[in-house]
Every structure is written in C-alpha cells, then in structure tokens.
Amino acid sequence: MKELTLNDVFDILPERAKDSNKGSYGRLLSVVGCRYYRGAAVLSSMGALRTGVGILTVCSTEEVMSAVAYTLPEATFLPRDELETADLSKVTAILCGCGLGKDEGVAQIIKNCTVPLILDADGLNSITPEDIPKKGNVIITPHIGEFSRLTGISISDIKSCPERYAKEFSEKYNVTVVLKDFDTVITSPARETAVSRFGNPGLARGGSGDILAGMIASFRAQGLSDYDAAVCGTVLHGASADLCAERLSMQTMLPHDILYDLNVIFNERGR
C-alpha cells in the first residue's frame, strides 16, 4: 500500500495559469447544513474556498446561508427549496452532506446527479449502498463508524484491515473511498490503494471532516479525477493539521485553524 507524501500532491496539482479566471477553477454546489449544524456548512465552505475552487454555491436553508454569508462573503447561494428547478448546467461537482441532517431529498439529489458527486456524513447516512450511482464519479468520505453502518461490517473487523474493506466496497459500487481514521485509506476501482499518515489527535473534533469534504470537493470541481482529488484533499488536510498542532498544540487547535497553515505548504512550493 502506497504511503502518500506532499510530493504526490504537488505532482498532481496544476499551477494556476496567469490567464485564468474564476470559471477556470470550477463551480461547486454544496448541499449542506441544517438549523442544528450551521457550522458544518461554514466549515465545508471554508475548506472549499481555501483550496481554490472558482465559484462556491451553498444550497441550504435561510438560516444556514446567513451563517455562511456572515463568515464568507465570497460564497454564493441557492435556497434549498429552489434546488429542483435551478439551472445547474455550469456546476462541475456537487457536495452533499456536512451537517445536512435528515433530509428526505438526499436520495433524489443523488439519483438526479449528472456531475461528480462527493458524499459525506449525512449524505451517506440517508442512503443505502444501492442508492449510490454506479456510473462512477462518486467519492464517499466515511469515518469508520459510518462505513460500518453503510456496509454492515463491524468496526473491529474494519479496523483489522481497512484497506481490504475499502477496496472491496470501491470495486463493488464503483466509487472512490476515503476511509477516515488515524491513518486514512484512499482507494478507487482502477487505482492502487494508498494511505495518508498525516494528521494528529488534534483533529478529533467535530468539524474536521466537514473541512476535509470541502477540500476534496473543491479539487474535484476544479477538474481533478476522483482519486486525485481525494489524495490532494486528504494529504493537505492532514499536513496542515500537523503544522497547526506545532503552532497552537493538539489540545487547543480547532478544525478551522488548520486552514491558516495551508498557505505555508503552498508558499514553500511557490504556489
């Protein structure tokens, strides 16, 4: 199993072209958040914008959109009740989950999706594996507990051989799997299984996964493949968390703090 490095990330990521514009870096639609988890929408949006997506549109309730707008004036918005009739022809990826709560419309969103789809947290908890489109272009980002619910395999069995179970699920359902744990396993049907050993216990807080999902979705919206987007998002998330722990400490760091260490990684490589 390949152990990922930051060199792998920057071998994948193209430099931003001098003659580019916001349309050059994709349009991400994030169906996220509910009244109880407004912060999840904010955090996933921060993760997406800080990793370079050209246009982010947050689709949610008024109270969630207000929370995101207060924090991130760069975001655009689509009321949740307008999603079914909206023109999504320019959207290059959809993120579904991240504090969405129990939303009966999730299965329909997934069924109707014609662009790359990233499913996190409640985006996964509201469906069965059979609901996942078999056409490919789907990334799922479960932690061990969510993966256990999704597969029916016990947590102890998954922990004993995460790469095996992630690969089997990936091949059976034609998806890219980001199986989150202290070491995060990434696999897809046609690519080798890899592991990211970046990250630390300072990430063991609510909200860390929301930022990761936003980062992965951002890279997918920018045109990276499912697997490459998962690799770049996961490694950068963990590596910036390690820098953050050095700067603040694992005990006191918060999930959004890691985004202020991303610039160090990019600046060191002239990006």
Located regions from the model:
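Small-residue (G/A/S/T)-rich helix-start motifs and N-terminal tracts that mark the onset
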Residues: M1-P116, N125-I139, S148-R271
